[in-house]
Design a protein with these regions (language model features):
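Extracytoplasmic gate region of multi-pass secondary transporters
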Residues: 116-186, 236, 240-241, 271-272
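A late C-terminal transmembrane helix in Major Facilitator Superfamily
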Residues: 250-283, 289-293
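Hydrophobic core of transmembrane alpha-helices in multi-pass small-molecule transporters
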Residues: 219-242, 260-261
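Central mid-sequence intracellular linker of multi-pass
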Residues: 15-34, 39-121, 285, 290-291, ...
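Intracellular juxtamembrane helix-capping segments at the cytosolic ends
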Residues: 7-10, 234-249
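Paired intracellular helix-loop junctions of major facilitator superfamily
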Residues: 17-20, 242-254, 280-281
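Hydrophobic alpha-helical transmembrane and interfacial-helix anchor sites in secondary transporters
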Residues: 14, 187, 277-278
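Structural signature of the two symmetry-related core transmembrane helices
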Residues: 196-211
């Protein structure tokens, strides 16, 4: 359910952004690992309600509560943001709406979505870059989920920490990952490029993963955890923003967002199976699988970048128009 909601949220957010502005959503993924060890809830309450269930119950209740509040406060699409009703808060004046709509229209000419047509919607799946972005995202979530699922086990069985210490040591790498996300989002906006940060994260993964798996020093291995965790999690907003900058048309963008989320789930399945307890303490097969994913991120990103660079060069020379819009250029 939340996966389908996530793709819808992406489609809405990216409808508000213009490629020239290069606004990046700042994503902060700070996970509090100690809550997995001893959440502040009763051991049990009622028939079948163990304490760990409250983690999911509380998250579900908060999601519903925020969704109900958001129904009123979340801003509508740009062209509708000046309207108000009993269920929708007015956010902009009409002159502000006109300015924003004009800016987005000048950038990509897709403020108002075309009438939905299944054939045209599915036609977007024939675009190779849609699957290129999906493959990069799948490789990224392979590493993301692998670390999220197995980091406590790696810290405990692979590095010798106690269960309590292992759960406490989960949080710092995610705090660091949040900082890296913010820095890369700012740099992407400042220099108006996206792919270098995707490649940078792939390189960080290729440095951090072997350190995490093969170094003899526990300190060096834990430092590798910081690099690998930052690389995997910081790459998520980089890829989402890069694909949004290079996909034109609301229905095609919706298809691409859904494809990314779906392939991200596939990456989660892969990441959830590569680390096995019998491979302790170094977990060599899992580390190698994640390193292959990091290398694939770099390779596919370079291939997409080459495609975009050649298309921009051809369009600048008066050749084939990109995405059916004169003046549109791919973001590298």
């Amino acid at each position: 359910m939340m996966s389908s909601a996530f793709s819808g949220i992406l489609g809405y957010l990216f409808s508000l952004l213009s490629g020239k502005g290069y606004q990046a959503a700042y994503w902060l993924g700070v996970h509090h690992g100690p809550t997995k060890k001893a959440p502040l809830t009763p051991v049990s309450f009622g028939p079948g309600l163990a304490g760990w269930r409250y983690i999911f119950i509380l998250q579900g209740v908060l999601t519903i509560a925020i969704g109900l509040v958001g129904w009123y406060f979340i801003v509508d699409f740009p062209e509708l943001a000046a309207k108000s009703s009993t269920l929708q808060k007015k956010f902009l004046d009409q002159d502000e709406v006109d300015f924003i709509v004009a800016r987005i229209e000048e950038d990509r000419h897709d403020v108002v979505a075309e009438e939905f047509n299944l054939a045209k919607y599915c036609k977007g799946a024939l675009d190779l870059k849609v699957w290129g972005f999906a493959l990069i995202f799948m490789m990224t979530t392979t590493v993301t989920y692998a670390i999220a699922y197995f980091l406590p086990i790696i810290l405990k069985d692979g590095m010798g920490f106690s269960p309590a210490a292992a759960n406490c040591l989960i949080a710092p790498p995610y705090v660091f990952a949040g900082m890296v996300m913010m820095v890369m989002a700012w740099l992407g906006d400042k220099y108006r490029v996206r792919s270098p940060w995707v490649i940078c994260n792939g390189v960080l993964a290729l440095i951090g993963l072997p350190m995490m798996g093969f170094c003899s020093s526990v300190g060096a291995r834990y430092f590798g955890v910081f690099l690998a965790t930052a690389a995997a999690n910081a790459n998520v907003p980089c890829i989402l923003t890069w694909q949004a900058n290079n996909i034109r048309g609301q229905w095609k963008r919706a298809l691409c967002s859904a494809t990314l989320v779906g392939m991200g789930g596939v990456g989660g399945v892969i990441g959830g199976t590569v680390f096995r307890t019998e491979d302790a303490p170094h977990y060599k097969p899992g580390i190698i699988a994640c390193m292959i994913a990091g290398a694939m991120i770099i390779l596919v990103t370079c291939l997409l970048n080459l495609k975009f660079w050649l298309a921009n060069k051809r369009a600048n020379a008066g050749g084939k128009i990109i995405e059916g819009l004169e003046g549109f250029r791919y973001t590298l």
